[in-house]
UniProtKB/Swiss-Prot annotation:
InterPro entries: Tscrpt_reg_HTH_GntR (IPR000524), WH-like_DNA-bd_sf (IPR036388), WH_DNA-bd_sf (IPR036390). It comes from Mycobacterium tuberculosis (strain ATCC 25618 / H37Rv). Pfam families: GntR. GO terms for molecular function: DNA binding; DNA-binding transcription factor activity. This is HTH-type transcriptional regulator Rv1152.
Length: 121
């Protein structure tokens, strides 16, 4: 199965397209659909397949790379990293949480307070 077969973007979702792509790749890694070493389509190829701008896919790939979920090997392409997907997913979630906390002007201790009060399911 190819990435384009299950990767979808919804312009009406109220969530940025690059973030939809990023989240779906993370979900694919966590579910085992994208095992370590899987080569992802080029930015242009995936953008063309999904009907989105190349910059949208490029931003999703950059964010995935900064969270160590994918690694770019120069002209050889972009691949799913060999790191533990749980670690990579949690790093991405933490980065997003920190970004929101900073945007709200919270201190580190205030942000941590919110985490300690999350109810158990």
């Amino acid at each position: 199965m190819e990435l384009r077969d299950w990767l979808r973007v919804d312009v009406k979702a109220g969530k940025p397209l690059f973030d939809q792509l990023r989240t779906q790749v993370i979900d694919g890694v966590r579910a085992g659909a994208l095992p370590p070493g899987t080569r992802l389509p080029t930015v242009r190829d995936l953008a063309g397949q999904l009907g989105v701008a190349a910059n949208t896919v490029a931003r999703a790939y950059r964010e995935l790379e900064s969270a160590a979920i994918v690694e770019t090997r120069g002209r050889f392409g972009t691949f799913i990293s060999r790191f533990d997907p749980t670690d990579a997913a949690m790093a991405a979630a933490a980065k997003e949480y920190v970004g929101v906390a900073r945007a709200l002007g919270l201190t580190k201790s205030d942000a941590m307070r919110y985490l300690t009060h999350v109810p158990d399911d």
